Curated annotation (Swiss-Prot):
Metabolic or biological pathway, per its Swiss-Prot or TrEMBL entry: Lipid metabolism; phospholipid metabolism
Native source organism of the sequence: Desulfitobacterium hafniense (strain DSM 10664 / DCB-2)
Protein name in the entry: Phosphate acyltransferase
Enzyme Commission identifier(s): 2.3.1.274
GO molecular function: phosphate:acyl-[acyl carrier protein] acyltransferase activity
Amino acid sequence: MRIAVDAMGGDHAPAEIVKGALRSIEQFDIEVILVGQPERIKEFLPQGEVPARVRIKEATEVVEMDEHPAQAVRRKKDSSIVVATRLVKEGEADALVSAGSTGAQMAASLLGLGRIKGIDRPAIVTVLPTLEGGKLLLDVGANPDAKPEHLLQYAMMGSIYAESILGIQNPKVGLLNIGTEETKGNELTQATYPLLQKAPLNFIGNVEGRAIPYGQAADVVVCEGFVGNVVLKTTEGLAGALFQLIKEKITATPLRKLGALAIKPGLKEIAKMMDYAEYGGAPLLGVNGISIISHGSSNEKAIFNAIRVAKECVESGFIEEIKKELPRFTAAQE
């Protein structure tokens, strides 16, 4: 198995990207193709030598975060994200991972890999930590102006991903809304609800945002990209602020510091559970290839886990499963 990694994408590229890639070949039986500028990549390789099961593919350009994604992808044919995507398209790699511009990765994936036939818009799916383990939320940013049929497709892809990757049998699918009643919501959610009811899914109805952290209502929560991105970033910010507040309060006095020692192991476990780096990357579902989007501030651990996610996606064959199941969903709507 070969994973193409955009070595030039991200706030800490190429250092943390290369470190994460090297860690992945120690843990997994894979080959990593580091795509980018060879002289910069080699600075972070042991003794500047390319180890076994690592290959460097030269790309002379980089799409910067402040560039217009689609325009940059079309203009910079030799950028690291375009070259990495091309490797997947041409069969030289089985998946790609990037912590660079999300918009550029989406554009490169759509232009280079194309959409799965029958999927109108791709969706970014992420795993959210909950009291019941990891649950899926999609879309978290690919398509901020979705239509009801798009949300139906997201629900189908999310359900297959939950079964294939998370091992959840017959996953419960919920529609993110402002209330649990069927009549709640805006035009989009009200039009989507009957489509999900009719679909061959384990649809449990509307889910409120406050139910997501508990993880009991649904295994897959579906929404348009604008709302999903707000939920994701609010969750990240709230988790960070909460841990900062806890740290300040439990170390405020000498007596509290003593008590903090007793609960430190538990706090470490919670911090690990809430750490985005543990979850690695978010797959772009709906494109005809495996494209894993990593956080722009990804460190070594996050890149390692993004490569792990890419490996699991390849092994699961979930893209072929989507292609196989799509006609059944289409027929149910006729």
